[in-house]
Amino acid sequence: TGGVGRRTHNRFKIVDLKPDTRKPNERRCGVVRPLDPKQTVYLSVFNEESQENGFGRVNLARPSKTLEYFTDTVTYKYVAGAAGTDRIFYQKGNFRECYDLYFTDNFFKTSTKVSAINPQMAGYRWGSAELFRWKAYDGTPLKGIVFMPDGVKEGEKLPVMIYFYEKNANNLYTFWSPAPSRSIVNIPFYTSRGYIVFVPDIVYKVGHPGESAYNCICAGAEALCEAYPSADRSRMAIQGQSWGGYQTAWLITRTNMFAAVGSGAPVGNMTSAYGGIRWGSGITRAGQYEHGQSRIGKSMWEPGALELYIENSPVFHVDKVQTPVLIMHNDADGAVPWYQGIEFFSDLRRLDKPAWLLQYNKEAHNLVERRNCKDLSVRLQQFFDHYLKGAPMPVWMKTGVPYESKGEYSGFDNAE
């Protein structure tokens, strides 16, 4: 493209209109079908600054002279097309609009809407999505998404729910389906109930994943409250799953900024998790810490490494925890060993910290059975509503549910 993508911060990817004739093993191995160097190809477009999406086309023989493209405040999904023509079926949507089907035969100059799959959305307080920028405590520029409820009144103060996992700003124009939770808070469910939902990006420093989360997330929470007067600084919660669940667990050993947190499938102790395996694949977990997502960057026996493993393990710092925490960890988790959640919960309980552990029998890293997803959704709602909205504490939080009553009695009714 003659450097157009670099200059305009656009990423271009080829969209192949031809049927995929690759064999299954070729698809698995990522075998790419060769392109005619003289053909015109369609492109998907993503702008890294605005997070907008779009389509383009270019002749491979003369890319700098034939490139044409557009972006918009939606996510486009290619569905089907006729090679050699401009006839394309595609989907588009954003936070407020689900992915309806459209047809164009003149490279998007005009389009015809083919479906209306979610007309019932009009009756709900859905909310809006906005790109938010701030600087981490160390000055690193960051991006995130702020989901605002509809109909916020001047002077009204709202609770804030923070969800995170690596980087999500590129999902600014994604449609989030309201559905029972497999592990994380459902964004439109919470915005429709009057929560501001903040989804921050995180930039990591090798050796200090916990402090990196603090550096980005907590700075973002403070910046959010400065930029949005309706955000109530005293009623902020945070929720994460897996890698996000670990960082949530670590954050409450570092700060008392949050009124309540939800931690799903957390690694509580990196020193004990290091020598384990991922039960689903049988792969040793050591590589994850040495050069993978956990970002310690060293084996546990290299000079100075043990201190990093301890620094980044929540169980060694639970004496500092004051924030109520709801943990979910399941006995068939093949990604993060179940004993990690047990270890974290047991240590919190030993020190009489406000902690609850949810465990769904025979469920894996993320819930599958719909009844369990619905159960988790209710418990997340009751937990956060109690601490952020002053709702009554349910029985399961007040006195717990005996093991022999599990699956028969929910404890959802009010204890007060």
Residue ranges and their predicted role:
Residues 159-163, 197:
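Hydrophobic beta-strand anchors of alpha/beta hydrolase catalytic cores
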